């Protein structure tokens, strides 16, 4: 499920510069700013990885 806690994703930065706001006690959605085909798949995979991590934490 999605909550009011979202990743704040700056797609103009590199992966190592990504700034995330995450409440680890809840499954988080992603707010995508300036989406493009080149980064949508990466974001989906990252979201899935985080969801898995949260479920296993």
Swiss-Prot record:
What is the protein named? Answer: Aminopeptidase A
Q: Which family does it belong to?
A: Belongs to the peptidase M1 family.
Indicate which residues are glycosylated according to the record: 12
Q: Does the keyword Metal-binding apply?
A: yes
Q: Which reaction does it catalyse?
A: Release of N-terminal glutamate (and to a lesser extent aspartate) from a peptide
Write the record's keywords in alphabetical order, separated by commas.
Aminopeptidase, Calcium, Cell membrane, Disulfide bond, Glycoprotein, Hydrolase, Membrane, Metal-binding, Metalloprotease, Protease, Signal-anchor, Transmembrane, Transmembrane helix, Zinc
Q: How does it sit in the membrane?
A: Single-pass type II membrane protein
Please list the GO terms describing molecular function. Answer: aminopeptidase activity; metal ion binding; metallopeptidase activity
Where is it chiefly localized? Answer: membrane
GO CC list: plasma membrane
Q: Which cofactor does it need?
A: Zn(2+)
Could you say which EC number(s) this protein's record lists? 3.4.11.7
The note describing how and how many cofactors are bound reads: Binds 1 zinc ion per subunit.
Q: What does this protein do?
A: Venom protein that cleaves N-terminal acidic residues from peptides with high potency in presence of calcium. It may have several roles in venom including alteration of blood pressure by cleaving circulating angiotensin-2, general degradation of host tissue, increase of permeability to other venom components, and/or processing of other toxins in the venom.
Give details on activation and inhibition. Inhibited by the aminopeptidase competitive inhibitors amastatin (Leu and acidic inhibitor), and bestatin (Leu inhibitor), by chelating agents EDTA, and 1,10-Phenanthroline, as well as by Zn(2+) ions. Substrate specificity is modulated by Ca(2+), Ba(2+), and Mn(2+) ions which enhances the enzymatic activity for cleavage of acidic residues.
